C-alpha cells in the first residue's frame, strides 16, 4: 500500500458493521477510514450540532471493497473532491443537487468540466471482476441465462455510477501488505 502512493485509504467492506481490515498495521496509516464512520461524517458534518471527528478528504485515494457501500464511499469522496475545488466559485453550491444530477451534469450548468479541475480522483479496488461484484443478487437456483443477465446488470449499474461520479475501478486487485 505504501509503495502505491495513495493519499488516503477507505475500507468499505460490510455495510451494517465494518469488518476489520486484514492487514493489522493499516490503522497506523495517517488517512485510513472505515466506511461507516466516514459515511456518518458525510451525512452530518454540515449540521451545527455535529461534534464528531473531522475527515480530510484527499485526492488520489483508494476505496477497498466491492459492494454498494464501497460505491457510496467512492461517490462521497468524489463529491467532496469536487466541492473542494468549486464551492467558492459557485454561488449557492449544493452538494445534494450535484449528487442527484451527477458530477458532469452539475458542473456543466456552470460551464465547468471535471477534467479541468485537476482532480486525480478515487479508485475502487475490488478483488474480483466486476461481474462478481454483489450489486444485484443472483438466486442460488438461477438459470444460466438469469446468471448472465444479472452479471450484465452488475456491470451496467457500475458503469452508470462511474459515468455519474467519475471514480475509477481496479478489478482483480487486492492489497496484500503495507510495504
Regions found by a protein language model. Name each.
Residues 1-23, 176-179:
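Feature captures the FAD/FMN-dependent oxidoreductase FAD-binding
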Residues 2, 47-50, 137-140:
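Short, surface-exposed amphipathic charged segments that create phosphate/polyanion-binding patches used
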Residues 3, 52-56, 114-118:
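Solvent-exposed alpha-helices and their adjacent loops that cap or buttress functional pockets
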Residues 5, 27-28, 165:
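Short, structured coil segments at secondary-structure junctions
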Residues 9, 83-179:
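A Rossmann-like FAD-binding core segment of flavoenzymes
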Residues 13, 65, 126:
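Short beta-strand/turn micro-motifs composed of small residues
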Residues 18-111:
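Glycine-rich dinucleotide-binding loop and its adjacent helix/turn
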